[in-house]
Regions:
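Membrane-helix boundary/helix-loop-helix interface segments in multi-pass membrane proteins
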Residues: 2-6, 28-165, 344-357, 363, ...
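Alpha-helical transmembrane segments of multi-pass membrane proteins
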Residues: 13-27, 55, 82-86, 127, ...
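Hydrophobic alpha-helical transmembrane segments
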Residues: 46-54, 292-313
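Hydrophobic alpha-helical segments of polytopic membrane proteins
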Residues: 71-77, 149-160, 168-208, 214, ...
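Hydrophobic, glycine- and aromatic-enriched re-entrant/interface helices and adjoining loop segments
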Residues: 103, 194-296
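Interfacial segments of multi-pass membrane proteins
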Residues: 172, 177-191, 269-295, 356-369
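Loop-to-helix entry and N-terminal half of a specific, functionally important transmembrane alpha helix
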Residues: 314-355
Length: 387
């Protein structure tokens, strides 16, 4: 039995695109930091090649053996322990960003444990939900009691990630995965809706507990309010309208970069907003930088590649006879989909920016390797299905 070649090729093409733009978009960053011109390119090339090899070697494992289960549980436990100890590591062993330690330094590279934790979490939920949730109809109270232990643990673990790493984006993704996979496992729509309500309430509490987040939400709403206020009654307009608002610097230049690229772009390597105007253009704002250079047409091609990859994973999931494999593949597809849209909507101000990487495109080894582990597992599972 062979793994699915289409998924492997689609993933490899996206990785290659990410490698190319790690060189093009980092032109100013390497000068500013005093690095060699090929610093980010060589590192991303190494991440990409090793990621493809990870996919290939994992795909050779038999998914019906205990090895798959042991590897995924080990990934979950090791990454979870790393997340716990990360805030207590000395500065020479941990890299900080946004006022919080998020990476563990291992020689010349830094590892973000939360990226690997998400993959382990998806497998654990697939395995555990299969044992606890079935397709039989139950009263909403019974379903809540089944899901309650997961919610309690999720609030504790995800809350710890949010507090210690100040990373709302990863927390939102993790909570979404827990709810969505419960639905895929057989939970009712009522339970899913109930979970969304609870998650929304928790989200509001988190946002309004921080003045900085209130200001970010206010700035975001101020940028898009003109599209919605005409549909609101006058009394509501008076309440929600933001009178004084300044467009965030990064979002402003992100939108300008996209507009400057037009339909066909300025040409590979010819973007100007990467030259100090738009920071983090090779990481969080990679889609804006790419669009400036290859235009909306080029961006559309990338979106189509992503869509084909995600649909392929869903197709593999739909053909799985093993329920654990079905839920796991669905979780990987949802992770890719949700991460892509969180970033894409954030850089054009449709949603608040959360600093979530674009899978396979954004510069960084942790995101690359974790996604390649997930894709390798899907490829491994694809050997057991008829496509």
């Amino acid at each position: 039995m062979f793994a699915d070649k289409k998924l492997f090729y689609l993933s490899s093409i996206l990785i290659t695109i990410g490698i190319v733009f790690s060189y093009s978009l980092s032109a100013f960053t390497v000068l500013y930091l005093g690095y060699d011109d090929f610093h980010f390119f060589i590192r991303q090339l190494a991440f990409g090649i090793s990621g493809i090899l990870i996919m290939f070697f994992i795909s050779q494992i038999n998914p019906d053996t205990a090895l798959f289960h042991k590897l995924m549980i080990a990934l979950l436990l090791i990454s979870f322990i790393a997340i716990i100890i990360l805030p207590f590591l000395p500065a020479n062993l941990a890299t900080a960003s946004g006022g919080a330690k998020r990476w563990i330094r291992l020689g010349p590279i830094s590892i973000s444990p939360v990226e690997f934790f998400k993959i382990g979490l998806i497998y654990f939920l697939a395995w555990s939900y299969t044992r606890r949730i079935d397709d039989s109809k139950k009263a909403i109270k019974s379903e809540i009691l089944i899901l309650l232990p997961y919610m309690i643990v999720a609030i504790i673990v995800i809350g710890y990630i949010y507090i210690t790493q100040n990373d709302l984006g990863q927390s939102v993704i993790s909570f979404f995965i827990i709810l969505a996979l419960a639905f895929f496992a057989g939970a009712s729509k009522k339970l899913f809706a109930f979970g969304l309500v609870i998650a929304t309430m928790i989200g509001f509490l988190v946002i309004f507990s921080s003045q900085r987040r209130i200001e970010r939400i206010s700035n975001w709403w101020g940028n898009i309010q003109d599209a919605f206020l005409p549909f609101f009654p006058d009394w509501l307009v008076q309440i929600v309208k933001v009178s004084s608002n300044s467009e965030p610097y990064q979002i402003s230049h992100s939108l300008n970069a996209i507009a400057h690229g037009g339909f066909f772009g300025e040409g590979l390597g010819l973007g100007i907003f990467k030259l100090g105007f738009l920071s983090e253009v090779h990481t969080d704002f990679v889609l804006a930088g790419i669009t400036e250079e290859i235009g909306l047409v080029g961006l559309a091609v990338i979106c189509i590649l992503y869509l084909l990859m995600i649909l392929r994973i869903f197709k593999i999931a739909g053909r799985c006879e093993n329920k654990v494999h079905f839920i796991f593949c669905s979780g990987v597809a949802l992770l890719l989909l949700f991460s892509f849209f969180m970033n894409a909507f954030g850089i054009i101000s449709l949603t608040p920016l959360k600093g979530v990487a674009v899978p396979l495109l954004s510069y960084g080894g942790s995101s690359m390797w974790s996604i390649c582990i997930a894709l390798g597992c899907v490829l491994m599972i694809s050997k057991k299905v008829k496509l």
